[in-house]
Amino acid sequence: MIRVGVLDLQGSVVEHMKILEKIDNVEPVRVKYKEDLDNIQGIILPGGESTTLGKLLKDFHIHDTLKEKIENGLPVWGTCAGMILLAKDIQGQEESYFKVIDIEVKRNAYGSQLNSFSIEEMLEDIDKEPIELVFIRAPYITTVGPNVTILKRVRKNIVAAKEKNVLVTSFHPELTEDTRFHRYFIDKFIKNK
């Protein structure tokens, strides 16, 4: 059984848990305290509000332990605000959080809640059929380092990338019924670790 953690401080936790429950041989685990990081094979940092999540990571004393585990190879996937937390740089903001993927992100790049949208797109690394991508006040990646692989662009903007054990997406696969992106994280990042 593969134990996949979902950071349970704020955001789309339940939605990620429900998708993970649909996948055979996967046990979703809520992660709220640093002790919850023991015995998981990967972790998802969900969408939410990045500033709030960053503060809660410190308040719950989980930031430093989680950062160390990611730096030591724990597979991690950040969706939307989770991507912001993992980025090396955040445009217009001096401080960043985990700094574990060599990207710069622009927060709320697609505008307000009213500018949220959904689109079906191909992601060749994942499947030959289109996947629904849901963007809600989404960030996008403005620059990538030399070791970062761009997985997807939408409207010329980078919305998915990976580097070593880190996967990031601007969009919310957990807000669809589709398990393919979660399976991709498990198959390519956790099983191939």
UniProtKB/Swiss-Prot annotation:
Protein residues bound to L-glutamine: G48, E49, S50, R107, I136, R137
Catalyses which reaction(s): aldehydo-D-ribose 5-phosphate + D-glyceraldehyde 3-phosphate + L-glutamine = pyridoxal 5'-phosphate + L-glutamate + phosphate + 3 H2O + H(+); L-glutamine + H2O = L-glutamate + NH4(+)
GO cellular component labels: cytosol; glutaminase complex
InterPro entries linked to this entry: Class_I_gatase-like (IPR029062), PdxT/SNO (IPR002161), PdxT/SNO_CS (IPR021196)
Associated pathway: Cofactor biosynthesis; pyridoxal 5'-phosphate biosynthesis
Enzyme Commission number(s) from the entry: 4.3.3.6, 3.5.1.2
GO biological process: glutamine catabolic process; pyridoxal phosphate biosynthetic process; pyridoxine metabolic process
Pfam families: SNO
Active site residues of this protein: C80 (nucleophile), H172 (charge relay system), E174 (charge relay system)
GO MF term list: glutaminase activity; pyridoxal 5'-phosphate synthase (glutamine hydrolysing) activity
This protein's UniProt keywords: Glutamine amidotransferase, Hydrolase, Lyase, Pyridoxal phosphate
Family, as annotated: Belongs to the glutaminase PdxT/SNO family.
NCBIfam families associated with the record: PLP_synth_Pdx2
Quaternary structure annotation from Swiss-Prot or TrEMBL: In the presence of PdxS, forms a dodecamer of heterodimers. Only shows activity in the heterodimer.
Task performed by this protein: Catalyzes the hydrolysis of glutamine to glutamate and ammonia as part of the biosynthesis of pyridoxal 5'-phosphate. The resulting ammonia molecule is channeled to the active site of PdxS.
Protein name in UniProt: Pyridoxal 5'-phosphate synthase subunit PdxT
Organism: Clostridium botulinum (strain Loch Maree / Type A3)
